[in-house]
Amino acid sequence: MLKFVILVCSVACVFGAVVPGGMLPQLDGRIVGGFEADIEDFPWQVSIQRGGYHFCGGSIYSPEIIVTAAHCLEKIDASQLRVRVGGSYWDEEGSLLTVSNFKIHEKYDAMIMWYDVALLKLSSKLTYGATVKNIELAKETPPDNADAVVSGWGTIYENYPYMPVQLRSVDVKIVSREVCRSDEYGYGNAIGPTMICAYAVGKDACQGDSGGPLVVGEALVGVVSWGEGCAYPGFPGVYTDVSVVRSWITENAKSF
């Protein structure tokens, strides 16, 4: 059964995407099967907030630019957004910054979730340190079965009514586009050319971790996008492949 748990009003207000086969974007914030984490281990991770609540994740690309998912920013105004950086907790620590503008990929399609990527421009520049740091963009798609880690904030069990405030992370394995659309898994042709998957039994990013980082080594390889339920057997998490949209990110980060 498809899952979409509305935990706070801000989540309900921002939701607007329709994904392949009725599957839903990961908007309510949970890392399933993971562990509590410290921001010093994920200094590129940010919490994107609206109305005082976390609803999506993101990654620091430069002192002014945050990479996130396009579906996080549908039907929303930049003035409503806040970004917390440098904190292990989405409701405290670090700095809470305003957003001056954002840009959604021109080819983003909410019906099929292709090009699910966007950029936020902060109103003030970040100062890098132990808890605030950018992450490099992957230049190529990682190989099948590569070790990866995904991080974010949110509930730790499906249908769990509370959203923990501390950052969490989970180790997963990369599933290539070809394998993810094969009979081994349940998505078929819903996996498009701008997507990559990651999977581990009982482990996953889920709704609300949207826009957050999938990392291999020291590179951002994916942006949390969509999936079937939370850690459902046979259904990997689906991410925007950063190597595919890398040139769009670098070019647009300079121009707005």
UniProtKB/Swiss-Prot annotation:
Catalytic residues (positions): 71, 116, 210
Site (described: Required for specificity): 204
Gene Ontology molecular-function annotations: serine-type endopeptidase activity
Biological process annotations from GO: proteolysis
Major place of residence: secreted
Recorded superkingdom: Eukaryota
Keywords per UniProt: Disulfide bond, Hydrolase, Protease, Secreted, Serine protease, Signal, Zymogen
Signal peptide, first to last residue: 1-22
Matching CDD domains: Tryp_SPc
Gene3D superfamilies: Trypsin-like serine proteases
Disulfide links within the chain: 56-72, 180-197, 206-230
Enzyme Commission number: 3.4.21.-
InterPro entries: Peptidase_S1, Peptidase_S1_PA, Peptidase_S1_PA_chymotrypsin, Peptidase_S1A, Trypsin_dom, TRYPSIN_HIS, TRYPSIN_SER
EC top class named in words: hydrolase
Protein family membership: Belongs to the peptidase S1 family.
Protein name: Hypodermin-B
Native source species: Hypoderma lineatum (Early cattle grub)
